[in-house]
């Protein structure tokens, strides 16, 4: 494989929309959660491969704002899987010099997923904030995890933030440019994807 890609132009930013894990499992007569677990294994391998190939940004859209409409049982299972996956991802990121950044609305997640308060429990849990903090100095690929993310939701939150800054006198409406709007988005500082795969 290495020889085959030697002369190819590697995209700077690849984005993956994770879709169909539940259907994959159902087609094989397995519970949907098995499909989600297999999806995580695939993402882990993809992170390592993308970092090795020299891709600068890899974005995975893994849990959209629409996913909260699934059954409480499935959402609960996905949150447990997310907790487990964050711990594994920290090891992978450190091993591969990968910086991790999460985009999306964090407000709906349980506090242990967002930030660990006090001492770590005996089984070390990794929060999103800890994962971002501990990989912030890594200089390799940036792995962007889009969770509880939706484009319309992102724009809505950005506009609200801009309006508050206008009310506080930090922003003058007449001075708002495309770059100003971009700076309020979750994706500020992240280039647009060159390749989107679903």
Task: State the predicted function of each range.
Residues 1-198:
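Flexible, compositionally biased loop and terminal segments
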């Amino acid at each position: 494989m290495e020889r085959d890609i030697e002369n190819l132009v590697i995209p700077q930013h690849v984005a993956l929309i994770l879709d169909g894990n539940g259907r994959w499992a159902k087609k094989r007569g397995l519970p949907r959660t098995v499909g989600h677990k297999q999806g995580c294994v695939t993402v882990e391998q993809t992170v390592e491969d993308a970092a090795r190939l020299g891709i600068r940004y890899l974005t995975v859209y893994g849990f959209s704002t629409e996913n909260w409409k699934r059954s409480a049982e499935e959402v609960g299972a996905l949150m447990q899987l997310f907790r487990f996956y964050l711990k594994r991802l920290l090891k992978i990121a450190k091993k591969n010099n990968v910086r991790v950044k999460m985009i999306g609305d964090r407000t709906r997640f349980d506090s242990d997923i967002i930030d660990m308060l006090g001492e770590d429990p005996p089984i070390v849990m990794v929060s999103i904030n800890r994962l971002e903090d501990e990989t912030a100095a890594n200089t390799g690929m940036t792995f962007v995890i889009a969770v509880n993310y939706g484009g319309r939701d992102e724009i809505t939150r950005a506009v609200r933030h801009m309006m508050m800054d206008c009310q506080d006198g930090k922003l003058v409406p007449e001075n708002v440019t495309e770059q100003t709007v971009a700076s309020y988005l979750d994706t500020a500082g992240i280039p647009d994807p060159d390749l989107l795969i679903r």
